[in-house]
């Protein structure tokens, strides 16, 4: 058939193609043929002239270039692939790379399946040119051409629907008319676009003291802000200066500039990401639609993709893409094809187009979860953006960390996306090769916010040359353009200088505005504006197309595709997958709950329905409710950690945030309900609670419902706050209030009148009352002998009372009456707790109301509060003192002198050991499941003094592995072969004599640049070198790496600290500061840098080599200029085989000669570094010729390498070895290490403001809550119990400390592992400094908590008592710190460490003697666990200290009242008993009702609990022993468990 059935968007491919493709839906193979197109757009001409037509791209990947023949049709150059070669070419492609041509054929195959004939579309093809065809020149739609098979045509004739795939992807075709298919052709116009941000202030590093000051100043500042007064308001600073431009549909614009030029700001603001800036001026329109309307009604059509590929890591690639498709499937369905079938076909199409089909069932992963590769993860981001259906997309530095081959695949993927969908695409890239640059239509060059150029990409280079800037041979266009904006790197043409060339950003901006290209761009923009003004069809088509995509139930003004309830259902399915794919989390969750239920159930095993079991039964119910309720705290960090994905997907308009809030709660119900059910059934029946199905299910219902309420509460807290530390501080206060005012510790009638209202606002109190009433309303309590008053006390010789409760006796529990041995459970809870059975279902309604309220708040907050929108980086600086000011002034003076050519960098101070480094027959094998894998295979090589050697190869070839092996960094696997320094095996000093700049920039984030370099110099240079000399050398390194302006900036982390490029320079600087005598290893030193920064790094390495340094450096496909800087090359192919080692030669002559002698002809204009990789099959192309590894092993060059190695060894062995005492494992002594590292750790903790302030805040908050709750207790019986509960809060502190200490230690250990590899300091030093640095804060927290608790509650004022109490609190702090660090040292990850906490804390809390008194414990636990529990010593010591000699006077209502027998006084009847048990008779002479007070002093309370005042110092000593034990575990684990597998 003709092309009549294809919409206009899909025509004008630009090349007639015949190729065999597979239908992604599984249909039989069919021929795709396109007729020549009579004319070509300007875009096609540009791509053809660059040698990059779509056919060219496929042809470039073939083995035989002669298979591609050029064919010219009309005015445009076109190339045809012969039909008989297409299959061979497809077969010869590397399996995991992107082809624009092949991707379009995949698209065409699926499009063919759904395209149908229509009279109207045929009419469109033949109708005369109209205004619509003029618009098409601006939209420049896709070039995919499709044919229907005969079978499909027959179906079309039978009238089986009318559908087109592009229409489904972009808009539904409704009532086709002569104007053609409605399309979302959105051109972007920006006029006088100006962005103003915060500037003019040097922000100082926050520290512990400033965090406290901020906390108390914040309310005052907020009040001032209401009146428009802000003394700390930053000054405005232009980030982008006014600029104008147009990018038409189907065009791609490359945004270039040095770091801080404003590229990210432009990409964000051009796509309506306006958060975080002070003011944005000018106007931005999208096909005539203003930015405000676009944001409100069409938000998902204009999107920004940040450079990080942040996805849900445990979802597979297919699940991630399918979810996006489900939220964006249009309303109009394919006749006869369900929405699921459409999504299946689209998923297959995307996986095939982007060549990630092999990863469909692999999890996406992230930095912590192993998944697909970085390049494949980038393609998942592209697929997700594709699914969004957005028409304007911007991508920010998206090739960071990718090798050149993967980066080119990425650029081609964007080209494919832009062409097929007619999108408008903005991209910023670093180190863009020429192949990438050729994918773009326009380029925007920014220079400190000024536009230096905006126009056609093919004209940019000549424009800059015309200004007077000289380019270099083989220099890529992108590097040249950005280099023109760098005052240090740009070069002027002969006879030109800064006086006659636009040199400043302002001058370059002015020159551009006065240029012919700018005038042309302005005319183009005005024409497009006029078109938009005169003909609203494009705009209306866009609006109508968006409207037609919406499903039933979606408002016309909504920017979402599916309805709110559909969104909930789709997210619900995704969250279920997430939950149940987390096998480790599920298994540990079930195991934790069941084990803790077994422990608690065994402690309270089969509680008797007696008076002795009444209080412990309430304790069991309390623990059952509280444990599950507090496990919901995990919702807080998970809610905040998932914000970036939530924010991005909301920006894509996949779903409303409120839908996510509802769906995530619902998706957690099956798992949480089952976990709580198992916990409840074990706890309930082991504890001997009332045995009936109805009672159990009411218990389970309220435990689960309370959990759901608390889960909703923590989720609400998570979305209401932007900072986790703030949320954690709030949570610590609120949880403390909730636990205290549940009704278990203090009955509501006993609560202070100014705080009792908390009980009625506390969800836990309603849940606890319900399960308490459910239990006690069903049972009667029998008074056992130990609770009968008065009773026989045989050990005191008192035996005259009846064995059964008589009329003159009573039971000493709530609700009892004289002479009655049974107490109704209802009476017990009514008298003691004011709980009633009639409140059960009332409380159910209240809890449901709480849940609905928190869900409503959560939905409101998540909808209207920004969830992670403000992503911008700031630098923070150390406050400048006199010394720093002098150093910085000197650096500034020398920098100007360098620029003026008055100074040269002096490296003469470097003292290198002129010893060769060789390796022979190197093999490396690692264990894998089922066997072993060889990663390095028989590698030979050497590094001579003063040489710069490049280590290159394909991704996965073993470059980093070889570097790790040579640098002695591997700790797993088997290494074979010889690694020799100076002809001898490497010794203990090798690692400290070498420097290794790893690819990951791992640093102590709180240090400044200068401090990081100083610590490296102090610890890695010999101790005898004077400190001043080390400091001076550090200043030289700062100069060499051009870090002068950042010398006092904190390294920080992404978003709060140095940029990626600056962090990379710091990584190199830290290694150079060590003055490595032997060797310098660098792994990807230019990764993530812009072209000029990469050139600066390599240029500096050359200077080091000139001073005698030996350098081995891995690098990803450098441009020709960078490649020329290296002296020697070691090239690896996949499998860890060497394919070349030797000199590169001037202009790469030696390397080129080797390649050409072995059958790989190097084109004259090719970059040898890129070509050699393609020749060996490292890129998309299959290798040229036979196995290059075999060629190398049989080559004379290899024989020469082996001969040279032998000569180097012989020469080295002939020289005498100079014995040096400094050749020890570490450069400095243990004490010097301890002092230096302790100073750094102290600084780190001081600057980690939120970490320490959150800890202190929690202590203050808990101390204040306990004080207010138990303020100045009197000497009543109830107050006696309250004193014990107040002391029990000391056991809460370790839980808070563990939650903070463990992550802190493990994150610090990551830095230590990197530094330990360089032998900076020992593991013992690391562990001790981590411990010692925490001590001052532990002391401060202990003092704060002690003062509030001890004197607020009203404990004894005697100094001996207060001193002991304080010492125990202090030891508790230290114990918690040492325990947390010991657990962290034993754990490989933060998650594993966190799993220990519930077991430890539950065990310690249950067996300490408060919730379960020792007499009530089962024999098994009482025999060993109670005395072994560290908290037993804490509680015993504190209780005996506080209650010893404490006088007790019963208040009215606390007396046990029973009648005296006739003829006897109360003293005669019960006086001996009262004396024996430590109580007293209040009315001894009475002959009526006797008033018995069960305690006279505190001893009577704690002696039955097996606590003794005389053993309190023994308890203190045992507690100290636990601390010592923790420290020993910490030191041993730190020494032997590095938890780093390399």
From Swiss-Prot:
Glycans are attached at residues 207, 397, 822, 923. Residues 60-69 have a biased composition (Basic and acidic residues). Disulfide bonds: none annotated. It is a multi-pass membrane protein. Its main location: membrane. PANTHER family: ATP-BINDING CASSETTE TRANSPORTER (PTHR19241). It comes from the Eukaryota. GO terms for molecular function: ABC-type transporter activity; ATP binding; ATP hydrolysis activity. It holds the Pfam family ABC2_membrane_7. Keywords: ATP-binding, Cell membrane, Glycoprotein, Membrane, Nucleotide-binding, Repeat, Transmembrane, Transmembrane helix, Transport. One of its GO terms (cellular component) is plasma membrane. It catalyses: itraconazole(in) + ATP + H2O = itraconazole(out) + ADP + phosphate + H(+); voriconazole(in) + ATP + H2O = voriconazole(out) + ADP + phosphate + H(+); fluconazole(in) + ATP + H2O = fluconazole(out) + ADP + phosphate + H(+). It comes from Cryptococcus deuterogattii (strain R265). The gene is AFR1. Induction: Expression is induced in the presence of fluconazole (FLC). The lineage of its organism: Eukaryota, Fungi, Dikarya, Basidiomycota, Agaricomycotina. Belongs to the ABC transporter superfamily. ABCG family. PDR (TC 3.A.1.205) subfamily. This is ABC multidrug transporter AFR1. Major pleiotropic ABC efflux transporter that confers resistance to structurally and functionally unrelated compounds including azoles such as fluconazole (FLC), itraconazole (ITC), posaconazole (POS), and voriconazole (VRC). Is also able to efflux the eukaryote protein synthesis inhibitor cycloheximide (CHX). Residues 1-84, 118-141 are annotated as: Disordered. Residues 18-41 have a biased composition (Polar residues). The chain crosses the membrane at residues 584-604, 618-638, 669-689, 694-714, 726-746, 844-864, 1253-1273, 1284-1304, 1335-1355, 1365-1385, 1390-1410, 1516-1536. InterPro entries: AAA+_ATPase, ABC2_TM, ABC_transporter-like_ATP-bd, ABC_transporter-like_CS, ABCG_dom, ABCG_PDR_1, ABCG_PDR_2, P-loop_NTPase. Residues 221-473, 917-1159 form the ABC transporter domain. ATP binds at residues 953-960. Disruption phenotype: Results in drastically higher susceptibility to fluconazole (FLC), itraconazole (ITC), voriconazole (VRC), as well as to the eukaryote protein synthesis inhibitor cycloheximide (CHX). It is found in: Cell membrane.
